[in-house]
């Protein structure tokens, strides 16, 4: 296959494109990007046939900041006839053998969502045809490749596959989360998604456990504090503004009316530091660096607000600088990852874990 198809947020195509060009070059794979603003996807077309599979295998999806999902794809199928869209798709997937799942998707745009009903109905007959051809197993198998059919326009689709161990478990790479009725703000979904994304499911009980101490910088009105409280943690909520009364009534929150940039925790046995402040990303990064150098937390999730242009370059520079500063100050054992999550808008979410080699 010659194309790598990447889902992203509408308006972030240039950032996703810039990132995949850098990552492909690191693997000495040549190609060029094809994208349009607000299409919510990027195509990286390789110069050599078969290189798309190399990228899909060797670039970790989790290591990409702006891509929600990716798959190796054939050339765009155009003019799929209304009377028989299935045959051309089955023919295009002849090199795929015994896949474990089928996903018929669209990009995440308002226009594309109008095709979602069609995609659901079309999935059933297409699944049967792919089983008959041998491209798809009779029963779903989470260890086998995933077939993707993405309709980018009426009668136009990219088809291909992703590897189950390097793929989002969600359609279009979008987790469907519901906001709780008593949550103080919609921002609560950002931290909920961040925990799901950055902390493996089998480790969540250990790393997000009841009784842990946490600090939320810039907490008002309590959207992020809410996620910590509902997991049984005790939270120092730092903000000059008022906190949600329901959170305060739990007895798990102590409100410090202070500037998050000047606050020093009275106790240093903190497992989680979280921060979602509207501030220059470099200043937030410097704040987290200071806490890390002082050894005041074990893990942190924080948001970096993005500039209007050159967002990939800005984030990459900030993360590289953070790694350099931590190492210069004797913090050598750490891991850092960033993702433009579905519930993020003009920001990216970063996870920093200190001493990941040590048990929790």
Curated annotation (Swiss-Prot):
UniProt-annotated catalytic positions: 305 (proton acceptor)
Catalyses which reaction(s): cytidine(2498) in 23S rRNA + S-adenosyl-L-methionine = 2'-O-methylcytidine(2498) in 23S rRNA + S-adenosyl-L-homocysteine + H(+)
Gene: rlmM
NCBIfam families, per database record: PRK11760.1 (NF008734)
Lineage, top ranks: Bacteria, Pseudomonadati, Pseudomonadota, Gammaproteobacteria, Alteromonadales
CC terms in the record's Gene Ontology section: cytoplasm
Molecular-function GO terms, alphabetical: S-adenosylmethionine-dependent methyltransferase activity
Residues noted as binding S-adenosyl-L-methionine in the record, renumbered to the chain: 187, 220-223, 239, 259, 276
One annotated GO biological process: rRNA processing
UniProt record similarity statement: Belongs to the class I-like SAM-binding methyltransferase superfamily. RNA methyltransferase RlmE family. RlmM subfamily.
Function of the molecule: Catalyzes the 2'-O-methylation at nucleotide C2498 in 23S rRNA.
Species per Swiss-Prot/TrEMBL record: Shewanella pealeana (strain ATCC 700345 / ANG-SQ1)
Protein name: Ribosomal RNA large subunit methyltransferase M
Keywords tagged on the record: Cytoplasm, Methyltransferase, rRNA processing, S-adenosyl-L-methionine, Transferase
Keyword flag Lyase: no
SUPFAM superfamilies (UniProt xref): S-adenosyl-L-methionine-dependent methyltransferases (SSF53335)
Alphabetical list of InterPro entries matching this protein: RlmM_FDX (IPR040739), RlmM_THUMP-like (IPR048646), RNA_MeTrfase_FtsJ_dom (IPR002877), rRNA_MeTrfase_M (IPR011224), SAM-dependent_MTases_sf (IPR029063)
Summary of subunit composition and partner proteins: Monomer.
Localization of this protein: Cytoplasm
Enzyme Commission designation: 2.1.1.186
């Amino acid at each position: 296959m010659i194309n790598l198809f990447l889902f992203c947020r509408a308006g972030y195509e240039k950032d996703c494109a810039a990132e995949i060009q850098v990552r492909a070059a690191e693997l000495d794979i040549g190609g060029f990007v094809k994208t349009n603003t607000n299409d919510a996807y990027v195509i990286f077309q390789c110069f050599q046939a078969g290189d798309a599979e190399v990228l899909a295998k060797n670039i970790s999806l989790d290591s990409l900041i702006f891509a929600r999902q990716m798959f190796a794809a054939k050339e765009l199928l155009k003019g799929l006839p209304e009377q028989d869209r299935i045959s051309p798709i089955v023919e295009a997937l002849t090199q795929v053998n015994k896949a474990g799942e089928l996903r018929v998707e669209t990009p995440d745009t308002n226009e594309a969502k109008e095709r979602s009903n069609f995609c659901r109905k079309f999935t059933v007959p297409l699944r049967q045809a792919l089983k008959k051809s041998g491209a798809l197993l009779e029963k779903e198998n989470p260890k086998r490749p995933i077939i993707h059919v993405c309709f980018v326009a009426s009668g136009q689709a990219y088809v291909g596959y992703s590897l189950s161990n390097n793929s989002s478990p969600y359609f279009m790479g979008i987790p469907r989360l519901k906001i709780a009725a008593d949550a103080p703000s919609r921002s609560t979904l950002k931290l909920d998604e961040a925990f799901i994304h950055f902390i493996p499911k089998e480790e969540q009980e250990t790393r997000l456990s009841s009784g842990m101490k946490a600090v939320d910088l810039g907490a008002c009105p309590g959207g992020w504090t809410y996620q910590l409280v509902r997991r049984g943690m005790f939270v120092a909520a730092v903000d000059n503004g008022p906190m949600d009364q329901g959170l305060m009534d739990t007895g798990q929150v102590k409100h410090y009316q202070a500037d998050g940039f000047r606050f020093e925790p009275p106790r240093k046995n903190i497992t989680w530091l979280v921060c979602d402040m509207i501030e220059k990303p470099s200043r937030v990064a410097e704040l987290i660096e200071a806490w890390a150098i002082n050894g005041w937390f074990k893990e942190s999730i924080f948001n970096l607000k993005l500039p209007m242009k050159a967002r990939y370059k800005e984030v990459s520079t900030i993360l590289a600088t953070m790694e350099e500063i931590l190492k210069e100050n004797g913090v050598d054992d750490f891991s850092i990852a960033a993702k433009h999550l579905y519930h993020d808008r003009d920001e990216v979410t970063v996870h920093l874990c200190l001493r990941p080699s040590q048990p929790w």
